[in-house]
UniProtKB/Swiss-Prot annotation:
It is found in: Microsome membrane; Endoplasmic reticulum membrane. Its main location: membrane. NADP(+) binds at residues 60-61, 195-198. This is Flavin-containing monooxygenase 3. The chain crosses the membrane at residues 511-531. Liver. The keyword Lipid biosynthesis does not apply.
Amino acid sequence: MGKKVAIIGAGISGLASIRSCLEEGLEPTCFEMSDDIGGLWKFSDHAEEGRASIYQSVFTNSSKEMMCFPDFPFPDDFPNFMHNSKLQEYITTFAREKNLLKYIQFKTLVSSIKKHPDFSVTGQWYVSTERNGKKETAVFDAVMICSGHHVYPNLPKDSFPGLKHFKGKSFHSREYKEPGIFKGKRVLVIGLGNSGCDIATELSHTAEQVVISSRSGSWVMSRVWDDGYPWDMLYVTRFQTFLKNNLPTAISDWWYVKQMNAKFKHENYSLMPLNGTLRKEPVFNDDLPARILCGTVSIKPNVKEFTETSAIFEDGTVFEAIDSVIFATGYGYAYPFLDDSIIKSENNKVTLFKGIFPPQLEKPTMAVIGLVQSLGAAIPTTDLQARWAAQVIKGTCTLPPVKDMMNDIHEKMGTKLKWFGKSETIQTDYINYMDELASFIGVKLNIPWLFLTDPRLALEVFFGPCSPYQFRLVGPGKWPGARQAILTQWDRSLKPMKTRAVGHLQKPALFSPWLKLLAIAVLLIAAVLVF
C-alpha cells in the first residue's frame, strides 16, 4: 500500500498532483468544494465564496504549444490562444484520458488540516472535511495544497480617502462577469494588470468612458509577436535565457526595454512603468493601445481621493460623474484551513522552499503546488512541481537541511526583488526554475550533449520554444512522443490558422545563422570541457 495523500483542489494543480501521485505509487484523494474540475478555468455566472472567479470573455495568455501537459498536446485544430471554455474542455479530456476523476470527492470542503500528535515521527496530518452537512476527519501521510492564488481578493478600500462617500458602485474585479450592465456608463478601473486591462477594453465598446488608474504603469504585450507568431513561442526560449544570464546587465536591460517597446512607445500612451527594467510580468492585451488611440480608454495615475461622484488623481486631474469603480487589485494568499505558522505569508512573502515546501516542518509531507508565477505557463510548471513533490513524499528525493533551505529562500528573495520588484515575490524566471526542478528528479536536459548526439532536436530545443515536452524528453516519466512533439510544434501552432490555401506554412527563422553558429560553438566547447 502506498502512502495516502490528500490533495486540496481539482484545478490544473490538483489534477497534476493526482497524476504524479499515481505515477509514484501513492494513493491520492482529492477534495474539491465545487461540482466540477478546472478550478480557475471553470466559468460560473456569479462569484462564489472560496472559489476563483473569471469573467465570461477570458482567453489564455499562453499559447497552446507552451501550456499543455507535457505528454498531452492540445488537438491540432485548437486555436493558439483559447477561450476559457475551450481550455476547460481540454482539462476535462485530460482528466478522463488519465482516469483521474475517480480520485476526486466533489462538493467537499476542507475545513482544517492539523498535524498528527506524532507528526515529528510519522509526518501525518489530520484532514477534516464537510460534505452535505456531514463532517469527517481522516489521517493522511501527506498533503498537497492546490487551491491556487486567485481566491481571496485584495480590496484596499481603506487606501482611498473618500471612497466611503462615493455614491456609485464599487467592487472587486472577481465580481465582474460581462459588460452589458455598463452600457452608457462611466467606469473607473483601478489596476493595470491583466484583469484590469481586459475589463477596461471590453467595457470600452459599450461604456461611455473608461479610465484606468495605475500607480506604477506596466509593459503591455500583444499575444501576436514578430511576424504574427505567438509571443511565447518566440520569447520563452533557452537562447533568450542564455543571453539574459550572460550579457552585461546594461545590455540586457536595454534589450529588454527595446523588446517591450517594439510594438509601440509606452511613454506616448502613458503606460511606461516607473522602473522599466524590472522583469515584472507584463500585461497581455491586444486591444488596449487601439482603445487608447480611439479615446475610449485613458490612463491616469493613482487616485488621491474620491468625492461623492468623482475621482481626483495625484496629478490633480478629475474623472467626473463616475457610475462604477472596479478594483482590479489582485489577490492575497490565504489558507484558512491551515495554521498560519506553517506557511507564513506577510508583505506578499511566502516562506516556501522553491515555492513548494514549508522548510520548517520536521517531515517534508506538505507541498504547495501552483503558487509560483512566471512568464511561462501554469500547467507545465505545476506538472513538474507535482512530480518533484510526489517523489519527496515517497522518499525517492530528499530535501536539504532546514538551514540550507532558509538560506536558499533568502537568496532567491533577494534575486526576485532585484528582477521583479516588491509586489511580485511569487514571480520567478520560468526556464531557470523549470531546469532547477528538472534536475531534482533527473529529467534536466544536457544541452551540449544533445547538440553532439541529436543536433536537429538540439537546435529546436535551444533556439525554439521551451515547450513543455522538453521536461518529459528524458529520465523518469519520459514520454516516447516528446521528441516528435518538439519537432512538430510549429505545425500544430500554424494549423488552426491555415483555413485558406495561400501557400506553404511559414515557420520562423528563429535567429540569424551567425548567432546560431556562435552559440553552438560555445555549447560544444562546454560539452568537450565537461566530458
